[in-house]
Amino acid sequence: MAEPLKKPEPPEPARDTHLIGTPFRRVDGRAKVTGTTKFADDLAFARMVYVRLVRSTVPHALIRGIDLSEAEKVDGVLGFLTGKDVPIPFGILPVSQDEHALCPDKVRFAGDPVVAVAAVTEDAAYEAAWKVKVDYEPLATISGIEEALATPEPRIQDHGDHGNVHKQVSMTFGDVEKGLAEADEIFEDVFFYEGNTHLPMEQHATVAVPEDDDRVTVYSSTQTPHYLHRALTKVLEIPASRVRVVACSNGGGFGGKSDPFNHEIVAAKMALKLGRPVKITLTREEVFYCHRGRHPVLMQMTTGIKKDGGRVSITAQRLRTALDGGAYGSYGVASTYYTGALQTVTYKMPAYEFQGVRTFTNKPPCGPKRGHGTPQPRFGFEVHLDKIAVKLGINPADLRLGMLAEPDSVTANWLRIGTMGLKRCIEAVVAGSGFRERWGKLPEGRGLGLACGSYLCGAGLPIYWNHMPQSGVQLKLDRSGCVAVFCGEAEIGQGSDSVLAAVVAEVLGIALADIRLCVADTDLTPVDLGSYSSRVTLMMGNAALQAAERARDLIAQAVSQQLEIPQSRLVFAERRVFDAADPDKGLSFQDAVIAAEARFGTLGTTGSYIPPRSPGRYRGAGVGPSPAYSYSASVVEVEVDPATGLWNPVHVWIAHDVGKCINPVLVMGQVEGGVYMGLGEVMMEEQVFRRLPRHLSGALVHKFPSVLEYKSPTFEDMPPMTTYLIEEPDPQGPFGAKEVGQGPLLPVMPAVANAIWDAVGVRVDQVPIHPHMILKGLQAKAQGAPARFGPKAFPEIDFGETLLVPTPDEGGDGTAINDYREKLRSGMRSSAGTMMTREEALQKKRLAALTTDLKGA
């Protein structure tokens, strides 16, 4: 029987803050706006050489030979690398170690790297790269999901569940068939979400510098220095102590720099080979090839609805997803699970079935992009709900408000919800936009759409399961009154450096100017797993909070003794430590540190963070759990020209449950940035591939490998926006804070689709929404057919054996009743890979630092 969920107690009573919750300048703001920030491509070292990668010109082929003879004649060429020089595979997930720094014998997409050329100048490297000749033996090319399902041979990868299916998932929570049978009405829809790329302002760049004793330092525009360090150590076959990774400031990442990449490993290998610094900066075209962008996903959604007077509830839902994963694994196993995992955290759903499949195709590999795996099903779900509301004659806002998931509850698929501000988010955007009064009543061509969303505040488990902290922070206090803060977090433009500094400054009562940051350096900083899954504020923030509170306690002991004041009366504020009862009695923070050092010696403290254990213990439950979930709601107003199908957003209202604002200005920037990215995806952005006609070879080609042709919105395309920051402090977050980097994007795309329906009565069930789609819907409407544009059917797919997991309401314990394979696994983790506590592991006489293999997960 599942234990009833108890609301976690706050670590201490709510307290007044001085810096937290107020607008303040970013700690890196001046450097960013004056151009003095050093990005990876800005770095230069003596005797530095340049490397270009020779990439495959065909999408699928065996490598029969490489001719370097003409390239070797180019003046300034220093050396080459091929696949035989870096034979060890790598990948971000333990279960998908399927990439090579350079392809040894086979290319899997147009753009796969084959040869690296080093030269003293960039021009020489380019010229030599063009003169490398590669002899290919073409193989059959697989272009999409249905083709991959129907074509098991030739296999693109040797691993995966079968044929060209990388991963298949099937799990049922509760009695879905019974729930559908009890429904008054059953609704079913099919949706498609096209893939797209991250398009950060900064292209990927890396500089590798060889040092004494066969050491190498890699400076890179990475979001995950810890995982890059791991990959370099593996592929280069040198001890971890010989590899240093420094994550430079990123000019945007959005998930696109969270894998270890070929060019990073090639740069390090070439630097060690030549004994000289090596720089690789990708062109924008190359970024399109290695991007790891959003998966194209085809979805089928079936929902049972019960009507009880004016109240509507979901009885059960079945979701099926099919992902086009491209040529490599990347984060794909996790991506597959994410298309179904978070479906249950917004609305009550007593029974839920999720089936998903990820296929390999001969395209650049897909991975995590802002919202990782969740924008696609969220688009489908919110449009699906809008159709239900219209069919039942209910205002879409009332439909959602009547079926919200409960705070402090456990979902059917065993996700633990804490605080939940979605009700307030909906109420804010509905009131601000006049949705109740205006929806369905605007002139033809003008419409309003509402949608909601939710996202993680950090993944509950690390990529490599272990008992160690997911984030660590170390403080060094010196006699000047300054505090040095060391942390492995990566600043990718989201303001994490400012959050780190603010948490420490708040606890110690000092100014941001008194903080010195050393971040994202694997030689100097404690491990932080990186900037992904919206984990940084909550996880790094909690580690920083713990380290700062430990430092405060040491200082308080010394000041209490010196001033003969109880520690409980000491206040840390305004660069002083003073008596709350007599503020004139106290010490400057500098003198307080000196007193503490005199008593305790050199001052340094550490903090770390490990997420709470998830109640789910079935195979696959490792994807979805989070210490907390953020919530968002959006209303979008659009105008549509029925004659052309052209549409434009007129205004966006967005509300986000942020828990507690660390810095409202930073939060607003993240919310509005997410909205703009969402508008780009629904308006125009798509990573599209097309087959050439057979008489032109039938090859699979990239349609938009440039910013000019890919199309992304500019300032001219963006509408006015009204933003509401909803604060419901969550006890799991530092000062109650939750994520803000990814969640606000999720409701934007479905809100637009719903607004277009309100404007012209056409349902476009796919993203992006192009004018011709609206026109075709209008033409169908005029002919008396359904006014819809989108996929017509979901293919028949064998998803394999279904895991049967009883829900909390059914008295389940978080395990699957038929997961015999997992029941045989004992050891460090539960059946889901959810970690035991350290104490449990030690009781079993196992090493707390031992990591477990994801093989077969």
Residue ranges and their predicted role:
Residues 22, 28-31, 163-206, 296-383, ...:
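Glycine-rich loop/linker segments at domain edges
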Residues 90-95, 128-131, 220, 229-231, ...:
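Short acidic, glycine/serine/threonine-rich loops at helix termini
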Residues 74, 83-84, 237-242, 272-280, ...:
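C-terminal catalytic domains of large/alpha subunits in multi-subunit enzymes
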Residues 1-165, 186, 460, 856-857:
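Flexible, low-hydrophobicity surface segments
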Residues 31, 37, 205-210, 298-307, ...:
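Short beta-strand elements
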Residues 152-236, 403-482, 617, 696-724, ...:
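Helix-loop-helix junctions that connect adjacent transmembrane helices in secondary transporters/permeases
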Residues 244, 249, 253-275, 279-282, ...:
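Thiamine diphosphate
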Residues 27-31, 130-143, 223-225, 230, ...:
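Extended active-site and interfacial segments that coordinate phosphate-rich ligands
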